[in-house]
C-alpha cells in the first residue's frame, strides 16, 4: 500500500442498470462526499444517454467528476484514468471528503486497489507498424498472428478486440515479453485496500433484464437517436471506443433505414444484457472476498451495514 493512498473511500461496482448511480448519490448526500466515474464508456462526451451518464438532476444532487470529459475522437486508457483520478484526489478543495468510486469497469477498480500494471511505452515506429497492419489486415488476421507469438494472451482476447490485440503485439515486439508478464508487475494503489468500503451490487437476473429493457426504451424516447446522429456527424474512425458503445451500431442502422426501430431496440437490449452478464461474471470471479455483495442499493442501508467512513 502506498503511504498516501486514500483511506476513507467507498467503492461501488456492479453491472449496468443495477442501481449503482442512485446508491452513490445517496451515499454522497449521507457523507458529504463526491462521486468519481469508474466506467470506461461514461468518460466520453456526446453519448450522455446511451452510456447512462448521470442526468442533470443527478448532477444537482451531488458533485460528479470524470464524466464526459473525453472527446469521442480519443482513445482513453486505464492508465490515463488513473492519472486523472490521482490529480483529482490531490485537489485541495476535496481533501478530507469521501471519494465514492462508482461504475462497471473492473480494471479501473483493480487499478485503484492494486496499483496499475507497469506496462512499458512503445516506440512510435512499432506502434505505427502494428496499427497500420490492423487497418490493412483486420483484427482476426492479427489475432491469428498473436495466437502464434503469444498464445496465452491471445486466448484471453476476443478475435474482434482490435485495440487490445494491437497493444499485445506492440509490447511483445518492443520488449520481448508478453503483456501478461508486464501486468504482473504492479504499481502503487490510490485507495487503501484494507480500509475502503467495497460494495458490489448483484441484483436478480430477471429484474435486471427487465430494467435494462425499460431503460433502453427510455433512452430512445429521450433522444438517443439525436446523440448517435451527432456522433456520426463527427465522421470518426469506427474502431474508436466511443463508436463501439452499445446502441451506436443499432441506432446507426435505424438512421440508415436498414433496421426497424423495434429491431434496433431489441438488439440493443440483448447486447446490454449480454454485457451485464459479462460484468457480473468478472466481478464474481475477480473481486476479493472482502467485497460485500448486495442485491440492491436499498439493502446497503438496511440493518445498519453502511458506515460513514468519516
Swiss-Prot record:
PANTHER family recorded: TRNA DIMETHYLALLYLTRANSFERASE
Keywords: ATP-binding, Magnesium, Nucleotide-binding, Transferase, tRNA processing
Function comment: Catalyzes the transfer of a dimethylallyl group onto the adenine at position 37 in tRNAs that read codons beginning with uridine, leading to the formation of N6-(dimethylallyl)adenosine (i(6)A).
NCBIfam families listed in its UniProt record: miaA (TIGR00174)
Gene symbol of the encoding locus: miaA
Cofactor dependency: Mg(2+)
Enzyme class at the top of the EC tree: transferase
Protein species of origin: Brucella abortus (strain 2308)
Binding-site positions, ATP: 14-21
Region Interaction with substrate tRNA, residue ranges: 39-42, 163-167
EC number(s) on file: 2.5.1.75
Quaternary assembly: Monomer.
Protein name: tRNA dimethylallyltransferase
GO molecular function: ATP binding; tRNA dimethylallyltransferase activity
Recorded catalytic activity of this chain's protein: adenosine(37) in tRNA + dimethylallyl diphosphate = N(6)-dimethylallyladenosine(37) in tRNA + diphosphate
GO BP terms: tRNA modification
Residues the record marks as site: Interaction with substrate tRNA: 105, 127
InterPro entries for this protein: Dimethylallyltransferase (IPR039657), IPT (IPR018022), P-loop_NTPase (IPR027417)
Domain of life, per lineage: Bacteria
Pfam family, one: IPPT
Family: Belongs to the IPP transferase family.
Binding-site list for substrate: 16-21
